[in-house]
Every structure is written in C-alpha cells, then in structure tokens.
Swiss-Prot record:
Protein name: tRNA-cytidine(32) 2-sulfurtransferase
CDD domains associated with the record: TtcA-like
EC number: 2.8.1.-
GO cellular component terms, semicolon-separated: cytoplasm
Sample GO molecular function, one term: tRNA binding
Amino acid sequence: MTEQILERTKAQQYNFNKLQKRIRRNTGQAIADFNMIEDGDRIMVCLSGGKDSFTMLDILMSLQKSAPISFSLVAVNLDQKQPGFPAHVLPEYLESLGVEYKIVEEDTYSIVQDKIPEGKTTCSLCSRLRRGILYRTAKELGATKIALGHHRDDILETLFLNMFYGGKMKGMPPKLVSDNGEHVVIRPLAYCREKDIIKYSDMAGYPIIPCNLCGSQPNLQRQNIKQMLNDWDKRFPGRIETMFRAMQNVVPSHLADFELFDFKSINKDSGVINGGDIGFDKEEMPVATVEDEDMVQEFDPSLKLDVTNI
C-alpha cells in the first residue's frame, strides 16, 4: 500500500510538471509575441480568487525567476463586499507566497444590486465599476502594466459573442490601452487552454473563491457560447485550435469591410490578391494539432518515474 501511494504521488507530480511546462511555454510565447512585459515593468496582477488569476500569478512568478529581463509583480484583489466573501483567504495565501500585494475594499456589490433589476445580468455594470477601481489602483501603485487572467477560450468566446450578438468580427485583444487611455492592459494567458488551467488549478490546490454574482446567473450569452465551443471541441478535436489560429491569420481582402481594405480601387491591373477567388484554402492549411493531453494514470503501481529531473 505504501509503495502504491508513493507511485501515485510521483504520477501526480509528473502530471503537474507537464502541465506547468505547457502553460509556462504558452504564456512565455504570448508575452514575446505581443511584447507584453519589458525590462523594468511593474506588473499589477489582478487577482479575483478564481482559477485563471491564481494560475496567472503562479506562472508569472515562475517566469520572473528565469526571464532575461527584470520586472516586478504586485497582486491586487478587489474586495467588492459580496455577502459571505472570505476576506482572510487571499491575504493569507499571498503572505505565504511572499509576493507584494494590496487588497482594495470597495462596496460595488451594493451598487450593482441597487441599480440592476432582479433577474437581469449584473456583469456589465460590475465590470465597469471594477475596471475604474483597478485603473485608479494601478496609478496609485505606479504599475506600468495591468495583467488580466483571460485565456484562449475567453478570447474565442468573445469573438463569437460579437459575431452572434454584435455584428462584429471583434475578439479580446491580448494587449491594449485601457479605456481611460492611461494604462497598458495585458493578457499573458492568451495562448493557454482553459482545460489546462482547470487541471493545473486543481493540482495546485489554490484556495478558489467563487463569484456569487457572475457565476450564479443562468442562461448568460457567454455561457451559451462556451457550451457551444466545448461541444465542438469534443466532437471535432482540433477545431478550437484552428479557429484561434484563424484569429492570427486574418485576410482583409477576403472579408467585406471596405474600411479595412480598399476594394474600390481594385481593377484588372491590380493583379491577383491573396489567391484571388479561391474561397477555401483547405489544401494549403496545415493540419491542426491538439497538444498532448495524456496524463499518467495516478493509480498504476508499476509506474516508475524520476521526477527530480523533470
């Protein structure tokens, strides 16, 4: 029995290391591709208490130790005074990490409850209030960048939300200037899959704090989109990867936005543009690959792993 427990522990450690390596690689690639973090940056890491922001802080702290540049981190949590919110959890956790942090206390919960009729979604107002407070806090802390924990699935969901309900080809940018024009906002987990973050968070044992506002509201449009994408992912492995790659491979000449591409000046002397009238590039598209998700079976007593060299 003791040997079985030992082997199970090794398997768990192997799986954890494997996931961490993949998330680190994807995060590092996103940071490099979009120049998210520069030498001397002070990054305000927005920590909600959910799996995404915990993972983001974890990975950024890990990258900080090996990065070729120097940057500092300060974790910030907004205590919105939701009933039952365990105010002690995050300070205790952050103290144990030894990371600089700040807890901002603002009763946005009462404002949202007062302004939004019962049965209506609170996300929009809650988000606006939260952004304003975080922008102010970033200025007070002297932060050069604000890091949010949105991942690849969030970005795709936003794209489909805007297509289905807003009539726009618009997603969630990995890097942008804040609404008030004073801050640069980054999303280091932009290349990371939610399924990886869920597994990693479970293995890490983060003290997750559920949101009693957003998560408790049924039939949200985003939840419907998420369910649709999850269904596609199960039925057609690789489709999610292909769709996200499409967001990085936009061909304006083959869309219909005349402000994005100058269609009016096209004539027979313009030549063939981006393949001309070929509507589907299947022959030229690389085969979508799904990253290896295989996990070592935790209860296999025959497993022999040396995790010290992983």
